[in-house]
Amino acid sequence: HAITDGEFRRSYWHLDFMWGFHGIEEVELDHGYFFHGEETTHGSIKVSGKISGENHPFVEHYKFVKQFEDENCIARQTMPAPAQLLAELYREENGKNTDAIYPDHEQLLQDIAAAYRTVIQELYAVGCRNIQFDDCTWGMIGDPNYQNFLKETNTKVEDVAAEYLRLNNLALENRPEGLTITTHVCRGNYHSTWASEGDYFTVAPFLLAQ
């Protein structure tokens, strides 16, 4: 069995973790995420410099949960997947600032992956042996509406999926021995409403096979 803090320490399931990186700032956009019949609050992220992961505040979050471990359960640390961070950096107008700070896209991917590896190592150092990547990007890619948006920008769905896959796997390179990594995939959940819809056939060759 695994236990978590239920994300009660966070204002968002994903953004608080992203705000914990060096080089990323908290911002407010003109509108929030649009779920089925409902809009969220307007929080987002902005790159302000080189992204790195040392001294991440979620290490303290984990240490709080770890005290409740016993022979029947292990403390699990959940966090948004690296692909989710990348998606947020290119959410609507965010991409312009991201490209201005990181004109070399490959360097952006490498820095995100390195930042995650740093956090993973710091969590491992305080006893964490179970980490879960929460990743809504796969549900987004499978959504016909998002696929139509990509077509309008002459972007191939397969290229986006391949980049998300590569980034997630880069972040897991050289992970410590004995560390379990799991992932949670969904279409979003806000007041029991959803953000994405559609099947997973498009992403299965990436998400499930690689």
Residue ranges of model-derived segments:
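Domain-level signal for soluble alpha/beta catalytic cores
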Residues: 1-210
